[in-house]
Amino acid sequence: DFRRYLHKNLEDFIIETPLENSLELLNNKFDQSQIKTVQEKWKPYNFKNQNIDDFLQNLNIDKTVEISSINGGYSNALKQLNKFIDNGYEDYAKFSSNPSKEASSQLSPYFHSGQISTHEVFEKISNLESWTLESIDPKMVGRREGWWGSTENFESFMDELITWRELGYHTCVRRANYDQYSSLPEWAIK
């Protein structure tokens, strides 16, 4: 099953985290032909003398969609992570699926739009629990609980952060109809 596969292959990815300033490796050596192609498709726009309200009115977007109550950006994502650690994490395993309790991380919109990295969240929660690779219990491979060798909250949160996110990602990549009701398995429809 997927969890068993993930447990057997995850350690390398936990050890090898993204570089903090990976774009610096480019040394500003962009392929000029790619830049030209992008500029031909999306013409550069000078906003200096533009009335922003007029500009937005002319965009072909659904203007009935209301403004989100969630403030985006990295600093707000970090505030939400800290709020979760201070107010929800201690009850995560028990109440994360209960919408009337404030135990879920509420980080999904920040993950979705790339405003905070799962690697950063993993590192912060791991440090909170003093978790290390040596904590892993290889006898628990494939099990929902116990493999991480940590607290119930840590086990539950990592199952969501890593296992279910990866499963969702791979489902979207491998199933053309992932966004259709007909793609749901029979057990989920019931």
Question: Can you say where each PLM-predicted feature lies in the sequence?
Answer:
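Glycine/tryptophan-enriched, flexible segments
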Residues: R3-A188
